[in-house]
Amino acid sequence: MDLQTLIQQDLKYIWHPCTQMQDHEKNIPLIPIKSAKGIYLYDFDNKKYIDCVSSWWVNLFGHCNPYINQKLKEQLESLEHIIFAGFTHKPIVELSKRLVGLLDSRLCKCFYADNGSSAIEVALKMAFHANVIKGKKKNKFLCLENAYHGETIGALSVGDVGIYTEVYQPILLETLKVKAPCGEDIEESLQELKEIIASKKDEIAAFVLEPLIQCAGNMNMYSSEFVKEATKVCQENGIYVIFDEIAVGFGRSGSMFAYQQCGVVPDFLCLSKGITGGYLPLSVVVTKEEIYQLFYAPYYENKSFLHSHSYTGNALACACANAVLDIFETENVCEKNKILSEFIWKKMQILGEFAFVKNLRHCGMVFAFDLVGFEGQRKGLEVFNAGLKKGLLLRPLGNTIYFMPPYIITQEQVCFVIDSLKEILEQFRV
């Protein structure tokens, strides 16, 4: 099949995610990828693109990583998948023990799903159900404005990015929203949170937030002090706290898990994306013993948490996740990332010379800036298309440009990316 036929048949049969398909006819080229290695994607003309967004924030250690490949192949020879109700297997037992070993001792029970949105759904249902078991009629959730937690109904309900939620408002769950903090500016948000809790605490099952970074919310970064104080207020008032670390977990925020920078422990920790290094779908909700014990009862009491997915606990995905943890353990990843993050941040300062580049910011291995003064113009799309010509895969959030690379990117490759970005931005000078 030649390249044009491949593109034509894709557009004939496939409806791509988060895409206005008409754009592929006018504004955005559809690029078939033939192979990938390390930080590079290769198209059918053997042109290479640096994966600046870790393929939607999932790839940590490069495409076709030799070690993860090896572990996946080994697992393929023994077990690919089994029903995870009434059965178990070695990869998931090992993974669960290792995850719990990395977390605060209070987070000790793992419930698996197969994507980030599903992890949020699990946590929401668990929090609601736990309150039901305790005899409390709490049917609302508290969340932040500008939040994004996924695109299933429950996850959308606790989100606040209008492009995703607006059309579905009539069918979403009832939620209470708090002004999102920004940077060190947290007092107004905290006060609003306290006021809502003071008047509604008997109705609120849980508070959901992405600690430190609202990723799909234009990479809004905010103080760990807000996370700490908000969590304390909620837990002191009998409100469960759900941390969505689907994007920021596994080293992305600068620590292995973002909550570790905040001095508090959530009641539910949702993890996905980087957990398998970008290989296979997997997510997990890690919760506390006291929550688990609420559901632990004789069958006839009907307290079971009856939630399941066909591919829950997939052995191949778990083998990849164990390989990812091996790499973290043996290669001192988080410490190396601190050095790399500092280098990237210093290099990014050259972009500050443009008057239309505002709010240069970073947290761990997430870097972003905003293009201002272009209201009504799709400058982010222009950056995307110009990036492709220079061999960069960028995927701006509107006019917010971000850089979220695999951890294996070299300093030389970083310089190429940022110098190329500078050349692209030169075109926007008036």
Q: In which residue ranges do the predicted regions lie?
A:
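Conserved N-terminal phosphate-binding loop of PLP-dependent enzymes in the Aspartate aminotransferase
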Residues: 1-430
